[in-house]
Amino acid sequence: MRPHAARCCVRGTGRRLRKSLGEIPQAVAAARGRTLSPGTESPCLQGHQGGIRASGLVGGPVCDRYETLNLMTYALAEDNAERQQVLAECLDPLTLPVLQRIPKASITRILDIGCGQGNTTRMLAEHFPDASVTGLEYDPALVAHAAAHTGNRSGVHFEQGDASRISHSDASFDLVFTRYLLTHSPDPAAVVRGMLRVARPGGYAVAFEPDASIDYCYPPHPCMDLVNYLWNRAFPHPRIGRELVPMFRTFGPSRLEAGAVIGMDHDRGVYGRFYRLTIEALGPVVEDRNLMAQDDYAALVADLRRLEDDPQTIYFKFPDVWVIAQP
């Protein structure tokens, strides 16, 4: 056993830490309780029944609890450029095989919803070089950041807008794409409905979202239990991936294809950086919601950094679920 493998966040406040660790099973169970049971309806879908072009639809109801949580985690995408780049390094190799299922010749106009700093928009532009790509982002500062880091690349531009209230006309894009947006969204069903509305008949709406059911490494380390604990307490929809298929089906696509992938990192250390940077970005949330004693949190980050630098550690990322739907 490696010297640090049997310890995690043990300095200073053992009693409080044991209390925090004791709460983890209940917290994870509570998060799992949001998973749909057979015959029940997701709160994300309430009020969204009917066709994708139901009259007057611009968005939909917001679950108050999810809206509050979303405000806590939104900063993850705003000020952490390094994390966003590492996230792209983790997810691009998993996303591109999904995009390869779509015939390139049929794609000339693409909408990238929740584009953040523009990493996914640039990925789409590279994969579909003959298409024009529009990145849609709510935060004006991120729109400016994305544009500045894209330069004068032909066929790529960014605009400010609300993902749950897409302003574009019906059937105006060949491909509508989103990645890791619904997990943050206060109303993911409104986003999905809007995606199918603005995709043309025969076009494609593609979502790629996490199902953060487990985070683990080998050899196993107790730090990852705390990572899973925080992930399931801080994000609005940490397991939205498992709800994607029923959510898309609610809006009656003509065709739907879905699958799941699990990433593994044994030599680059990129997943280790991804977990550590995410937990660092959650610092204000941990403090504001008192999810963990601050010295325990600092010890967790330090342990994640040490684990990240261990060349013997193999990371297995939680599953990601993808859906390709056609209106």
Name what the model sees in each region.
Residues 70-80, 257-315:
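C-terminal helical/coil "lid" or tail adjacent to the Rossmann-like core of SAM-dependent
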Residues 88, 206-270, 285:
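Conserved catalytic/acceptor-binding region of the Class I
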Residues 89-106, 123:
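Conserved alpha-helix/loop element of class I SAM-dependent methyltransferases that forms part
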Residues 109-111, 117-165:
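Class I SAM-dependent methyltransferase SAM/SAH-binding core
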Residues 164-175:
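A short acidic, Gly/Pro-enriched loop at the edge of an enzyme's catalytic core
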Residues 174-187:
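A short SAM/SAH-binding and catalytic strip from SAM-dependent methyltransferases
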Residues 189-201:
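A short glycine-rich, Lys/Arg-flanked "PGG" loop and its adjoining helix->strand segment in the class I
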Residues 251-254, 320-327:
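Core SAM-dependent methyltransferase catalytic element
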